[in-house]
Amino acid sequence: MRVAALYDVHGNLPALEAVLAEVDAGTILVGGDAVLGPMPKETLALLRERDATFIRGNCDREVAAPGEGEELWTRRARWVHEQLDEEELAFLRGLPHPLSLEVEGLGEVLFCHGSPRSDEEILTAITPPKRLDPIFDGVTQDVVVCGHTHAQFDRLVGDRRLVNAGSVGMAYEGEPGIAAWALLGPTVELRRTPYDVEATVALVRETGFPDAEELVSEVLLHPPSAEEVTAHFESLAERQSL
């Protein structure tokens, strides 16, 4: 079985549609954070229509039970919560994390959002082995796929292969109009699918999504590079581990 790993869609329906038009795999694995974005209901419906397998991301938890603060992402989580009905929210609450699947040519692969032990732990292309070793303690799979940071990578950690599938809806690859994902089986392919970002921007502006212009300007039209994001997240992870 081949697996298309679609992570961090973040309610970007046009990007998702472009990727699904390319997917040729027996299983679609949604790696968390599918709905926290401007078109959540339509995104979730399309993925479920395609009979995708889901795991939980940190934003799925936040949407299912949003906080009361006024921070930007908290307000966005509340807005998405209000767009979904109770059945959809219950679906998000019931998502597993992590999940292992048998993949053609790769054996048993472990899919997680942040790390095998947490849906919000940060792993990057430059995370040092001293921090990775305890994270992988007890993990038996030779291939682990993660997301969360929106920046693709494929690296070896000892004998284990660690892959970040990137982000379908908010790819931090330094180029607008790119949806990043991974195709697994029998090898690992980091894929980048173009989509119409200008049309997406027009749709986003009509949704009522909180601070939509910030999303448009800072993510959709002018996304940071993988190098910038990796340095930022690794610095944050180092501070959190102290």
Model regions and ranges:
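Acidic, His/Gly-rich catalytic cores of divalent-metal-dependent hydrolytic chemistry
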Residues: L156-L242
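Core catalytic region of metal-dependent phosphoesterases/phosphodiesterases
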Residues: R2-R93
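Glycine-rich phosphate-binding loop signature in dinucleotide/nucleotide-binding domains
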Residues: E22-A25, V103-G105, D137-T140, L183-G185
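Beta-strand-turn-beta hairpins that frame and shape the catalytic cleft
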Residues: M1-A4, S100-L110, V157-R161, T187-V188
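Active-site-proximal segments of metal-dependent phosphoesterases and phosphodiesterases across multiple
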Residues: E70-R75, G107-V139
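Anionic-ligand binding region
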Residues: P129-V168, A179-W181
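Active-site environment of divalent metal-dependent phosphoester hydrolases
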Residues: H10-A15, L36-M39, C59-A64, D119, ...
